[in-house]
Amino acid sequence: MHIAVKIGAISAIGVLLSLTSGCSRHDNSERYILITVNTRLPYWKVAASGLAKAAEQYGVKMDIRGPELYDPTAEAQELRNSLALKPAGLLVSVADRSLMGPAIDEAVNAGIPVLTIDSDAPESKRLYFIGTNNMQAGVLGGKRLAEKLHGKGNVVFYTMPEQPNLDDRLRGYKDVFEDYPGIQIVEVFNIKGDSGNAFDRTIHYLTDKSARRVDAFVCLESSAGRDVAEALRRQQHASDRIVIAMDADDDTLTGIKQGFIDATVTEKPFTMAFYGLKALDDIHHYPEDLKRSYASNSFSPFPTFVDTGSTLVDKSNVAEYLKAEQESTSK
């Protein structure tokens, strides 16, 4: 038993070293592509910096492709178009699993390894997922909201239905609310990839006297928080409303500092892309049978899920996150 533990430790160290250090096996003909939607979002700019950092360390090429706006159909087509480039590997964030699942399978059938990051399609042939435990992220936000509401109040959610990571977060919130019958979900509103729709809907709830009073607004994706905060800023009588956001772009962190956003649940898009490229590179140079199912294989060379973590940011620690963001942009 003692010897087995030592061997396991040495093996684990070897895997970590292979993913965190460059070596002569690489050449600049290798290309790794990240496919996503809403590429203009700050969230994906952070992911791009992680992808670029890993590519620089390994001396390989990287690219981010996908529609600038929220368009799941265009994302699936972009993935298919990328196959002609014969990339060494693909990272994919899934906007709609019914569209992206078949496209991922086409890539794998063509011999291109695929990992999902940020949002998953577990029923596809992707090898594994690197990202947030989105159910747990929802639980984290839900516990915070239940505490701030003292167990009672009306809540509106802003999301894009059918996007797997957002659906998982909503389930996390709902799981928490089961213990608080005084918390009611008034609406789960589809912003259709445009945070301006969240702004308009929030103004509706704050100004329409025929609408039910809403005590809290929850943003399940990264862009709506700033727009909901702006709506509250313009309505002086709404300072008692609670906003729980998602992710840590500058506008969201500033909203927390100014008091218009109570808290945000942050992720690590830099880490997802950084380790995603390195993992794909390892698969490219030490190939396995991509068409084989590894889900129930006790000797699988691949994990099922790599959790990059999530954290709650509020006024008590927002300065730390703002400082980290400023340092990263000044490099």
Language-model regions, residue ranges each:
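Bacterial N-terminal signal peptides that target proteins for export
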Residues: 1-10
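C-terminal motif of bacterial Sec signal peptides marking the signal peptidase cleavage site
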Residues: 19-22
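Bacterial lipoprotein signal-peptidase II cleavage site
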Residues: 24-30
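Hinge/beta->alpha junction and helix N-cap segments in small-molecule ligand-binding domains
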Residues: 35-49, 64-74, 96, 119, ...
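Hydrophobic alpha-helical
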Residues: 89-108, 173, 192-255
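Flexible loop/hinge segments that line or gate small-molecule binding clefts
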Residues: 98-136, 140, 144-147, 154, ...
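Hinge/cleft segment of the Venus flytrap/periplasmic-binding protein
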Residues: 176-177, 277-331
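Extracellular/periplasmic ligand-binding modules, especially the Venus flytrap/periplasmic-binding
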Residues: 220-229, 257, 267-285
